[in-house]
Structure formats: C-alpha cells, structure tokens
Design a protein with these regions (language model features):
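Short beta-strand elements of extracellular/lumenal beta-sandwich folds
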Residues: 496-497, 502-525, 529-533, 685-701
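Secretory targeting and sorting signals
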Residues: 1-24
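Ser/Thr/Gly/Pro-rich low-complexity, disordered linker/stalk segments of secreted
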Residues: 639-671
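Aromatic (Trp/Tyr) and acidic
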Residues: 29-42, 46-103, 144-182, 186, ...
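Short, hydrophobic/aromatic beta-strand segments
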Residues: 518-529, 536-545, 700-708, 717-721
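A surface/secretory-pathway sequence property marking extracellular, secreted
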Residues: 534-574, 716-736, 751
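Low-complexity, acidic Ser/Thr/Pro/Gly-rich terminal tails and inter-domain linkers that flank the onset
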Residues: 474-505, 669-686
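Terminal connector regions
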Residues: 577-642, 750-774
Length: 774
C-alpha cells in the first residue's frame, strides 16, 4: 500500500476534522507537513527583489534591482521575482499573493501552531509594500518591471543583473481590469491576514484595494493590450471579467460591504461557459489567468446559493470522477495532469480549493470525502508518493530536484545555464513543474523550463494546502532551519603565473576573479597588490613597472611595506568585475617589474606558489592580495596575516561593462552534421506550443547557429524562448541567444515557441547555418 493509501485507510473510519483542528487530533501523516510548509514558505524569501530586510533568511541572497522605477521617476523596488528569471510580472505576483493570503485567512491557527505565521506575514508585507509603491495614484498601476526578452537572454544571479529594467503601467488611457482587479484581491485578502496584528496596515491595504477595484471597474480593458511585453509571458487569455468577480469577492470578505457582493454576483453572469452551452467552464482550473474557479468556491461558501454550489461541484467532479464522460487526465501513478507546463501547479491549485470547499461542504458526505481525498492524493504525489518515489519539492523528502531552472540558485558566473554543472544553492521549498504528460516521467534538467522551472504561482496554493494538511495530520517544522550555506570555494580570488622572466625582470600574468554567490556581488573598486623584496642594496628608484596586456587601470609603485619589502598596485577601479558573464567575472593584467640592479624573485613574497615556467597556466596565488576599497577579499600579506574576506553588504548594480579588446579567438567552422527534433507540446483552439531540439552529430563544435525551416500550414510564431525568431510567410529563421550559442560535438540545445494556427506537422526539412540538416 502506498503512503497515501495508508493515510486514506486511516481517515476512512474517522469523522473528518475541520481545518482548524489541532494537529494532535489528526491521523498519522504520510509526510512531515510541518517541514514542507516551512520550506514552501521560505521559497518566497528567496524570490525577494530590492532591499532585503535585516532578518533576511536566505544566506545567498543580497540586495538587487535597486534602480527599479528610476526610469519613470518612482521607487519600484521590492516585490517578488516571478520564477527562475528576474522580471517582476504584476499579474502572477498578485495572484500568488492572493492565494497565499487565502491560505493564511483559512489556516491561521495552522500557521501559528507551526511557527510560520510571522514568516507568512513578513512575505505578504514585503509583496504588498511593493504593490503600494506600484500604485502611486488611484488610476495608475505599474504592472511589470523588466523586459522579458532582455531578462531571459542573460543567465546569472539577481544581484548583478547588467540589463536595464524598464517599468510598464496601466492607467485610465490604457487600462487593465484584470491586473487592477487581481491586485485589489491581493491587497484585500492580505488585509485580512493583518486585521488583528496590524489594523493600521490592514486599513492601508484596503484603501488601495478599493481604489484599484474602482479603477478596474470604471476603465475596462485587458492589461496585456497595454503592457504588451507581457503578451509573450503572461497574456490575459481569459480576459478581465473573472478578476472583476474575484476582486469584488475578496473586498466583500474583507469589508462586509454588500455592494461588493452585488458587483461580484452581477459580473459572475458574464463568466466564461463551455463551448455552445450556458454551463460555466469547468475543464480548466484556478490559475493566474483565470480565477473563475476560485470564485465558484468562495461564492458558494459566502452565499450558499445553489448555482455556485453546482458550478463548484461540476468543476471538482471533472477533476475527480468526471462530467459528461470526460475528466482530467490521470497518470498511472495518480497525478491529475491538466497541461504540460507546470502540471503540478495546476494539481496543487485545485487541491487547495478542493480542501477549502470540502471543509465547508455539508449535506453531501460523498463529495466532501471525494474532494478531500483527491486533494490529499495530489499534494502527497508532489511530496513523494509517486512511482518515482521522489519529491518534486527542492530540498524536501526523497530524491528531490537539485537542478531547478532558476538563475540565482544556480549561481553561474559565466552567463551559462550549463556552468557550473550543479546548482550552488538549495532553493528549499520550490515546487517544480513536474511531469509534462500523464506518464509520471520526469528528468531533473535545468534546461527544461517546462518541467523544472519554479515560480511564485506554483507555490502559492501549494503552501495553503500544506497548512491545511498540517492542521489535520500534524508534522514538525525543523528547529534548525534555515542554516547558512557555506561557499563552495573561494568566491573572489587571484590566479597568477610567470608570463616571462629574465636576469633583471619578472612579468606576471594575473587574473582577478569574481565567482561570488553568497551573495553575488560586484567589485567596482578592486585593486591588486604584488609584494617583492629589493635585493643587493637596490633602491626603489631603480624599479620600474610596465604592462603588456591590461584590462584594469594604472600600475603604480613600488610602495614601501616594511624593511626591504615593497609592493606594486594594479588599480582595477575602472572596471566592474562581477559574476555576470565570461568577460565580466574575470579581468586580466600582465605586468612587468624591472630592476636596473640586482633581481632575484625567489625570495619575493607574492612569487611563492606561482608557476614559474613562462606561459604556465595561472593558479590560485594566495600571496597576491586583492582588495575592494579598504576591504581585503583575497590573499595574505607578508606578515603572514590572511584577512577574512568582507562581502559587500549592498551589492552595487552592475552596468554593462565595456570590455577591453582581447585577442579574437580563431573561429571554428560550424558542423554540417546535425539532427533536429520538432515536437508540438500543447494545442488549443487557435494556438499551440512546440519544442525544437538541435543536436550536433559532427566532430567540431558549432559556434553560433541559425536554424531554418518552413511551416507546412498557416502557423505563425508569436513568441519564443531560448532563441530569437523571425518569420516571412511560412519561412522561419531561428538564431541562438548568448547562453546556447555553442553546441559541442555530441551535444544538443533546444528552444521553444508559441504560435497561432493549427499545427500541420513537423517541417519537412531543416537547415543549420544555411546547410541541410537531418
């Protein structure tokens, strides 16, 4: 019997406790729901943008995106990064906040008993403080910060993002009822979480929520028609009427004002229906785009009216036993799979709503048990009760994912998704997308954003469901969580070797290296010190310095240290050294120290441990000192002192560095041997998504690629990821982005796109860099 089966067997003979039940009265738990709740909530700490609070719990996160809003003269810092990227998308952010708050409203006692209530409130305050900034006047709301394409083409930690981050808004001249209505719901629901502990803050949130709802109601429109950059990522497919219902429902719950209930019920009549029927839609679920299903549940609970009960029952029946001969797909292992992209997110959203509805439902014991058991099964599947016997929550349970598609937790310093091989940080609590089909199959692959990305909306209802299961089954949050991570090696260092030498000189080749990730930080005032000893009565005026190749600034000295020991200084304050790319994380300088008298480098302090054969590969040079301003970051001085590196407490936003020209590498001719896979991953009425894989089957690397093909039908690409796409008629040209420009022999890269039209099958032929590809 599976863990879930055992749990259900125990539950079957009991009267199901209410959501407020003490954990001590519950049946035995299949999993430690206390730990899962604790870690799922911590994930939101890791997603924070802007200035972090003094009690920041994520040892590898620092301040980031401190210039957000400057382009429009506002402070738009704060909020949450959306997913594994760093755009702040307002619609899913507000949806996530609403779902988190809903869980807090219904499961306050569970949050308190588990010791997580303060963390819930901290995260809701953090995101709502951002919503307040983003709503500078009644009919203005900033709904996105960061350009999607610019953000996605770069792979690195949030603290050193090099790109500009434009702000986008809706207003009375170009409105977005969906965005404003959802943000109103977020602030109204959050006000309920703070009503007892901070009534003044709750009142402030309600003021903004009322203004935002009035804005949404008075000026109708889809936000993605105004914030057009969002169309490729969070287009408002369902329109705005669902958010007008949703926002009014939450304002009614928060205020008790019957006028909001009347608005919700009036707008409800305009919610979508199944094709060519008057039946409310039931073959989808609660999500960032469509909140109708949450309104079914909440209006049933608030009014008891049969039409809302019928709509909620029909929806949840489709997810469990089926309606009119159809139901959601199920995998052999029991996962309800609605869609290929983030399938566990949809199952968790439905599970949370099912638990809320089941707790309220009376007079229908069959459905009450059905919906409850469905929810327990789906959450337990994500926690590890599945054919793989593996958790889908990072840092929790058995065999959890270790390579989520998440830039900052990966910690690359070279702007490469593949480097390093392993993620440098554990993104505790993050729910990954999960299987893309109803087959229980999954691979922990960082490059697979469909199955392995994480997002704030993935965890929102999941966290609430965990709180509900903690209330019923109990569990023990970890007493020592979180523990500060230890760096995986030197974050900032100097590597050096002898570049050339002679009777009166030594030339050193040195790299100033920044691979920082605890947190990532930029060096903007770096300097290097090389210590040496004067020999045979040579005076300092007989020493000179020159440079052969220099990505830094001036080389000065010699400067007296003590006795016969002097040092030369290489000033790198003209450069930004940051873990932000292959030319950004490392600066090279080749400097020569020449004496017109005696010269013996063997007794020089900084010469120790440096390879002395000219042309040797540079290695760590522990006797060369690297400083950032007055703070030593690397190396020991001649007195034997090895100072403790001092992290920069507030990372400086990194402008795009201007690289010093370096020798141009010899280009490698692209291989003409290749193989292409073309897979349509999902379809809907009028649209589809596809994944394309390109494999280098030749013996030479492909450095820079352009893939060409022609559609068989009238398909048209609307947006793409991991590539740039242009189209003329049926002819499509796809070009690499920075992080996947090189395809080594025997390796593959992939990209995906969304299109309109009906897929007519895979293209008949492909070309790579103008030559036929199989």
């Amino acid at each position: 019997m599976s863990a879930w089966g055992a749990a259900v067997a125990v539950i079957a003979g009991l009267v199901l406790p209410s959501a407020a039940s003490s954990p001590s009265s519950a049946a035995s738990a299949a999993f430690n729901y206390g730990e899962a709740l604790q870690k799922s909530l911590w994930f939101y700490d890791a997603q924070r943008s802007g200035k972090l609070p003094d009690d920041n719990r994520v040892s590898w996160r620092g301040d980031s995106a401190l210039d957000d809003g400057k382009d429009v003269g506002l402070d738009l810092t704060g909020g949450w990064y959306d997913a594994g990227d760093h755009v702040k998308f307002g619609l899913p952010m507000a949806f996530s906040a609403t779902l988190l708050a809903w869980g807090g409203v219904e499961q306050k006692s569970a949050y308190a008993a588990s010791g997580q209530l303060q963390h819930l409130q901290d995260n809701l305050r953090f995101v709502n403080d951002y919503f307040i900034k983003a709503h500078p006047s009644a009919n203005v709301l900033y709904g996105q910060v960061g350009n999607g394409a610019d953000d996605h083409k770069w792979w690195g930690p949030a603290e050193v993002m090099p790109m500009a981050r434009p702000a986008y808004k809706i207003d009375a001249s170009c409105p977005g009822s969906d965005l404003a209505g959802q943000t109103a719901a977020a602030m109204a629901s959050s006000s309920m979480v703070f009503a007892d502990s901070d009534p003044a803050y709750a009142s402030k949130l309600l003021t903004h929520a009322k203004q935002l709802y009035a804005f949404a109601d008075a000026y109708r429109g889809k936000y993605s028609a105004c914030i057009t950059d969002a169309q490729a990522y969070y287009n408002s497919w369902s329109g705005y009427n669902d958010e007008l219902v949703w926002g009014a429902v939450w304002l009614y719950k928060a205020t008790g004002d019957a006028a909001y209930l009347a608005k919700a019920e009036s707008a409800y009549d305009k919610l979508s229906t199944e094709p060519q029927t008057t039946t409310r839609s039931y073959r989808w679920t609660l999500s960032w785009d469509d909140t109708s299903y949450g309104s079914y549940v909440l209006l049933a609970q608030l009014t008891g009216k049969q039409r809302y009960v019928d709509d909620a029952n029909r929806w949840l029946d489709w997810w469990t036993v089926g309606v009119n001969g159809t139901k959601v797909r199920y995998s052999p292992g029991g996962q309800a799979v609605l869609d290929s992209w983030g399938s566990l997110r949809y199952a968790a959203n439905t599970a949370f709503a099912a638990l809320s509805y089941s707790d309220w439902l009376t007079g229908d014991p069959v459905r009450k048990a059905r919906y409850h058991d469905f929810a327990v099964r789906q959450i337990n599947y994500a926690l590890g009760d599945n054919p793989r016997k593996s958790s889908y929550v990072v840092g929790f349970g058995a065999n959890p994912p270790t390579k989520p598609h998440h830039r900052t937790s990966h910690g690359s310093w070279t702007d490469q998704l593949t480097n390093p091989v392993d993620n440098r940080h554990v993104l505790y609590g993050a729910l990954v997308g999960g299987p893309s089909a109803a087959d229980d199959a999954y691979t922990d692959d960082r490059s697979n954003y469909v199955n392995n990305e994480v997002a704030t909306d993935y965890n929102a209802a999941f966290t609430g469901a965990l709180a509900r299961l903690y209330a019923e089954y109990g569990g023990s949050p970890l007493a020592d969580f979180p523990q500060a991570e230890k760096p995986d090696g030197p974050e900032i260092s100097v590597q050096a070797s002898v570049n050339a030498s002679g009777p009166g000189f030594t030339e050193i080749k040195a790299y100033l290296i920044n691979k920082s990730a605890w947190p990532a930080r930029a060096l903007t005032r770096a300097s290097l010190r090389y210590y040496f000893t004067l020999d045979g009565g040579v005076t300092p005026d007989r020493i000179s310095t020159t440079t052969n190749y220099n990505q830094c600034g001036k080389v000065t000295g010699p400067t007296h240290f003590e006795g016969d020991v002097y040092f030369v200084t290489v000033d790198c304050s003209n450069a930004v050294i940051a873990p932000a790319g292959q030319s950004a994380y490392r600066k090279e300088v080749q400097f020569r120290i020449t004496s017109t008298g005696a010269w013996n480098p063997a007794n020089d302090w900084s010469y120790q441990a440096v390879p002395t054969t000219p042309g040797s590969t540079p290695v760590d040079a522990p006797h060369i000192v690297l400083t950032e301003g007055a703070d030593t970051q690397w190396g020991a001085e001649p007195d034997g002192t090895t100072p403790t590196p001092t992290p920069t407490p507030t990372p400086t936003p990194t402008p795009t560095p201007t690289p010093t020209p370096t020798p141009t590498p010899t280009p490698t001719s692209p291989s003409t041997q290749c193989a292409v896979t073309y897979t349509v991953t999902s379809t809907w009425n009028g649209g589809f998504t596809a994944d394309v894989g390109v494999r280098n089957t030749g013996a030479a690397a492909v450095n820079g690629w352009r893939l060409g093909f022609s559609f068989k039908g009238a398909e048209k690409v609307t947006n793409a990821w991991n590539a740039t796409v242009s189209q003329t008629g049926p002819d499509v040209t796809v070009a690499n982005v920075a992080h996947n420009a090189t395809i080594p022999p025997g390796s593959s890269t992939s990209f995906g796109f969304q299109g309109t039209g009906t897929p007519a099958g895979a293209p008949a032929a492909f070309t790579l860099n103008g030559k036929d590809c199989g």
